[in-house]
Every structure is written in C-alpha cells, then in structure tokens.
Amino acid sequence: GAFDITVAPLANAWGFGFKKGAFPDSTMIDSLLDITGYTKVSLSADGKVIKQDPRIMLSCSAVAKGYAVDVVAQLLEKKGIRNFMVDIGGEVVVRGENPKKSLWRIGINKPIDDSLAVNQELQTILQVTDVGIATSGNYRNYYYKDGKKYAHTIDPRTGYPVQHSILSATVIACDCMSADAYATAFMVMGLEEAERFADSHPDLDACFIYADEKGELRMFYTKGMD
C-alpha cells in the first residue's frame, strides 16, 4: 500500500531514516523490497508480531506525532477541558472554540523548499473545530544529488523517493493519527490517485498544494472544503 510501516530499511538506505545509508543502487533497492510490505507482517492470537523475515523493520514514525497529539487531547478531555488546541510539530487537534469564541484558524505553509524551516508564509488558512489535522510535504526534508532532488517520502511499492507534483498534503480527519497516515499516503499516491481516494472517502477532507506544468502553485480541495 501507499502507507506501509515496513518502509524503514528503504528510508535508511536513502538517508532519511534512523541510519544514514549510502546512495542505493537498483540492486540494493530490489533486495530491500524483498523485506518491505505490510503483508509480510501479522499478529498472532496472543498479540505477538510475526515477521516473515527477521530483517523486516517496523516504524510508526509517520504517525508518531499524530498519535502523540491524540493522546494529549484525550488527556485534556478527561480533565474536563472543552476548548483547546494541541499542536506537536504541525500536527493538530482542535476542540470547541478559540479564545475569540470562534472556529480555530489553522495555517498551511506555502511549500517552498526550506530545509531550515524558517519560512512562515502561509498558502491558506483553514477554519475548523473538533477535528485532527496533519500535513505531509516534501519541501523540508530533502537533498540534491547530481542536480536531482530526493525527498524523504519513499514509495514502499517501488522503493524510490516519490517524484510527484504534490508538494504538500493536508488532511482533516476525526483523529490526528489517521490524518497523519492519510497525509503520508497521499504524498506517495500522487495527485490523481490522491484526488480520487479523497473524494471517495467522505469521512476525510483534504487539501493538496501542487505545481502545475509551469511550476505555478495550485490547490485542490475535497468537496467538503468547498
């Protein structure tokens, strides 16, 4: 699938994981694909993880911030707090009203190549409440080699960093962990597949910022955000 928690060996090989690998060749990619794929992992009746190959690695880093946001939000709700925003690294849960007694305003950054994360220019602002929001993009964690850009989003189906027109994907869902996972998946899918998927799932809303043929920034919104 487009979202796969077994992608860690590939991320390491491309230099985006917890280990810094050398730039991989096609032979290495093919060998790593042999140990990539969620169908190679299952749960036993007593809840133990069963891997078809001991070299398979599981990494939930793509949803870690979203999960952490949900945990904090649940804690606040248990304490009886009804109006709040939790933000961890740009992944957000909002509940109730903001201090001005209106919907929460959440900005989406303009996806300009910015490895130092100093750009604060906004592409758009969402007005929402009682949702989880997550954004995934390829404009901060990347490098260039031989004049070609390689970003951190790895397609687990091919083993290579994605080369799509989508620059960032923002998802609104009932919880932040789900939004986080879908945002990553949409970055892997590419614009057309992501549009079809998002429009066919009315429980989600999504906003994609992409570059057209002239390199101009364009935006796609699901029907629920029109």
Task: Write out the residue ranges for each language-model feature.
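Mature catalytic core of soluble alpha/beta enzymes
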Residues: 1-226
